[in-house]
Amino acid sequence: NLTEKVDIKALLNRDVRPVLIIGFVLAAFQQWCGINIVFNYAEEVFASAGFGISSSLFNIVITGTVNMVFTFIAIRTVDGWGRRKLMLSGSLGLAFTYTLLGIIYYTTSGGYVVLTVIVIAIAIYAMSLAPITWVILSEIFPNRIRGVAMAAATSVLWIASTLLVLLFPFIKKAVDISGAFWIYAAICILGFLFIRSRLPETKGKSLEEVEKKLLRK
């Protein structure tokens, strides 16, 4: 209809390109930070650490519970701590835990040390990139393109998720699971640098203030 045509035309305007880039990169980064590998390939990840099937299933329950609990904590802290700070700390925290996981997998079989570090990584993700990305996406797009821009960013997120899941077996085969976690650590560092340089704090800002700040970039 006419409204959708107007929205799409506004989306293609060069003036909104900077904010679209930020939104699309954050959407892709939420997936390519790598934590969904733990969820989608949990049994394989834990098997590589020496756990049997029954232990792996128990570990999956633990990681799922941690994810839920810390997501609720994030909902209560997002306005106090700020979106940008949570995204930056989450990116660095994941980079550190992935680097540590890579070292553990490379040097030992892992065992419960792997489970502990993975639980920490999930807690970090659940308090930062998982929920806060959606909060930011809802705040950074100008009103005139918000609907179609959110739809486009969501599409980018799911495409990134699909690619992440499809490519992991090939990455693991090429560089082993330790190398895979080091690759995700590097992606998290790149995400941290992007957020630090391109994303302003949106907490307590009106939509108009956020738009002015982002469209100047």
Task: Mark where each language-model region is.
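Alpha-helical transmembrane bundle of multi-pass membrane proteins
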Residues: L2-K217
